[in-house]
């Protein structure tokens, strides 16, 4: 339980547990696949202006955490015959949602224009790839 949505969802799936949201799932996010991020960081190193800053991420689609859970479940059913469901609960931590913004979406215009950054892997494919990776590396990750 590292409190990041996709890793927690993947753990729930691989353990055969329901995915539990500790909110209504309405906050929105964009989700950048790791290879796109690494390519972006590389482009900053090679093409970026020293001392300048660049937002690396993905700007579309912006989806709710609930939708991310639904996408995860859909892929998990296809890949692993997952039987779990999306359920809603509450955190015992009264401050759980205190610093949780309703929206996170980077403006990557500068990175696109100045260093040629262009993320390619959408959230649907990224979630599927991530679930496959987690399933292949699950035991090793649990040992750490």
Question: PLM ranges: what are they?
Answer:
Residues 1-5, 27-28:
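Flexible, glycine-rich beta-alpha linker
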Residues 11-144:
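C-terminal substrate-binding subdomain of Rossmann-fold SDR/epimerase-dehydratase oxidoreductases
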């Amino acid at each position: 339980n590292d409190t990041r949505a996709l890793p927690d969802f993947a753990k729930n799936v691989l353990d055969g547990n329901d995915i539990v949201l500790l909110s209504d799932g309405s906050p929105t996010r964009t989700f950048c696949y790791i290879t796109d991020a690494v390519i972006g960081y590389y482009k900053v190193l090679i093409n970026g202006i020293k001392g300048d800053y660049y937002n690396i991420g993905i700007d579309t689609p912006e989806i709710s955490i609930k939708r991310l859970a639904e996408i995860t479940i859909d892929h998990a059913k296809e890949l692993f015959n997952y039987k779990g469901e999306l359920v809603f609960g509450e955190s015992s931590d009264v401050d759980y949602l205190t610093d949780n913004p309703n929206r996170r979406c980077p403006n990557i215009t500068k990175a696109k224009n100045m260093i040629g950054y262009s993320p390619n892997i959408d959230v649907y494919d990224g979630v599927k790839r991530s679930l496959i990776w987690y399933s292949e590396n699950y035991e090793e990750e649990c040992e750490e």
